[in-house]
């Protein structure tokens, strides 16, 4: 995988042509992003303009997490992440996929953070604050200090995944590392991260948030810091099984005849009525989403869901 570094001088059309990406495929992707943003397919050209402009420097930091959010982002489609997104943005630091290691990686991070044109910072993972922040180290520095030194310098900060947004499973009771989300840790430093939660979040929500920033669009947030364009409706209201809920038709168990008929999964634990996300609308990999596949929503985009939504298979 080739990762572009630095602000590119070539135009967007040239980059697409060099990567062998047809305009048709590119516009199909832009249409999907526009729809996910609630703008409608007519705004695909605006998304395309944002993605083919001058490449912004992006720094992607990891804290206490499982890397599932990165795995989800790497599986964005039409075109795939390695042929479009990493060449549209200049991903200057990402520990999981960058070729550099050790001192070379640290030098790349400092070069991006101190560059003349600024950078956007994405953060995946919760911040361990227990035992004087010593539960998590990278390159001899605590995760807390790394983010403390970098986030206030960023043009924008986006928390990727529920761990970075609200603490996630790291913050589940009894929370032995005193893990916290980004805004809980650094609000006193003036950091106000945009939260894109999920375990993992849909890649279109991640990309759409970046597109909105690149377009200079004002991003309306809900009371827990999520973009309303992606998290403004409940899973319940968007769900294709909603009509069965309204009709009082509930599957009594998994793999029951009623479940196979598409009846509502509320009685087997679905948390869709309490969860705000666009999973039924955008799907994952254009293929499916958990409830359509027969599994109840577990509320993974909500704060404290590991504690508040369990047991997952009861309501």
Swiss-Prot record:
Processing after translation: Predicted to be exported by the Tat system. The position of the signal peptide cleavage has been experimentally proven.
GO CC, alphabetical: [Ni-Fe] hydrogenase complex; ferredoxin hydrogenase complex; membrane; periplasmic space
Keyword Cytoplasm: no
Catalysis: reaction(s): 2 Fe(III)-[cytochrome c3] + H2 = 2 Fe(II)-[cytochrome c3] + 2 H(+)
Cofactor list: [4Fe-4S] cluster; [3Fe-4S] cluster
Keyword Membrane: no
Ligand binding ([4Fe-4S] cluster 1): 66, 69, 163, 199
E.C. no: 1.12.2.1
A Pfam family hit: NiFe_hyd_SSU_C
Binding-site residues for [3Fe-4S] cluster, renumbered to this chain: 279, 297, 300
GO molecular function: 3 iron, 4 sulfur cluster binding; 4 iron, 4 sulfur cluster binding; cytochrome-c3 hydrogenase activity; electron transfer activity; ferredoxin hydrogenase activity; metal ion binding
SUPFAM superfamilies reported for this sequence: HydA/Nqo6-like
The record's free-text note on cofactor binding: Binds 2 [4Fe-4S] clusters. Binds 1 [3Fe-4S] cluster.
Predominant cellular place of this UniProt entry's protein: periplasm
Record key words, sorted: 3Fe-4S, 4Fe-4S, Iron, Iron-sulfur, Metal-binding, Oxidoreductase, Periplasm, Signal
PROSITE patterns: TAT (PS51318)
GO biological process, one term: anaerobic respiration
Residues involved in [4Fe-4S] cluster 2 binding: 236, 239, 264, 270
Signal peptide: 1-49
NCBIfam families cross-referenced by the UniProt entry: hydA, TAT_signal_seq
Record-stated family: Belongs to the [NiFe]/[NiFeSe] hydrogenase small subunit family.
Subunit structure: Heterodimer of a large and a small subunit.
PANTHER family referenced in this protein's UniProt entry, alphabetically: HYDROGENASE-2 SMALL CHAIN (PTHR30013:SF7), NIFE / NIFESE HYDROGENASE SMALL SUBUNIT FAMILY MEMBER (PTHR30013)
The protein, known as: Periplasmic [NiFe] hydrogenase small subunit
Species assigned in the record: Desulfovibrio desulfuricans (strain ATCC 27774 / DSM 6949 / MB)
Lineage: Bacteria, Pseudomonadati, Thermodesulfobacteriota, Desulfovibrionia, Desulfovibrionales
Underlying gene: hydA
């Amino acid at each position: 995988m080739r990762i572009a570094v630095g602000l590119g001088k070539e135009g967007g059309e040239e980059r697409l042509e060099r990567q062998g990406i047809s305009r048709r495929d590119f516009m199909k992707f832009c249409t999907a992003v526009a729809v996910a943003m609630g703008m409608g397919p007519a705004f695909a050209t605006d998304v395309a303009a944002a993605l083919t402009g001058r490449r912004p420097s992006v720094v992607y930091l990891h804290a206490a997490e499982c890397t599932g959010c990165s795995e989800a982002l790497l599986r964005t489609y039409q075109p795939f992440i390695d042929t479009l997104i990493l060449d549209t943005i200049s991903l200057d630091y990402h520990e999981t996929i960058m070729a550099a290691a050790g001192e070379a990686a640290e030098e790349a991070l400092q070069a991006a953070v101190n560059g003349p044109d600024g950078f956007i910072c994405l953060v995946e993972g919760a911040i361990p604050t227990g035992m004087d922040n010593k539960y998590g180290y990278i390159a001899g520095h605590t995760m807390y200090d790394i983010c403390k030194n970098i986030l206030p310098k960023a043009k924008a900060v986006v928390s990727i995944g529920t761990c970075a947004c609200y603490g996630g499973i790291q913050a589940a009771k009894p929370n032995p590392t005193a893990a916290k989300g980004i805004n809980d840790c650094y609000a006193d430093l003036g950091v106000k991260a945009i939260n894109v939660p999920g375990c993992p979040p849909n890649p279109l929500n991640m990309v759409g948030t970046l597109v909105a920033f690149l377009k200079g669009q004002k991003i309306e947030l809900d009371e827990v810091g999520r973009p309303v364009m992606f998290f403004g409706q409940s899973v319940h209201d968007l769900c294709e099984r909603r009509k069965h809920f309204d009709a009082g038709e509930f599957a009594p168990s998994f793999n029951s005849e009623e479940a196979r008929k598409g009846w509502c999964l509320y009685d087997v634990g679905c948390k869709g009525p309490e969860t705000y996300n666009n999973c039924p609308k955008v799907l994952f990999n254009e293929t499916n989403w958990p409830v359509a596949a027969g599994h109840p929503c577990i509320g993974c985009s909500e704060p404290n869901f590991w504690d508040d939504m369990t047991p997952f298979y009861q309501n």
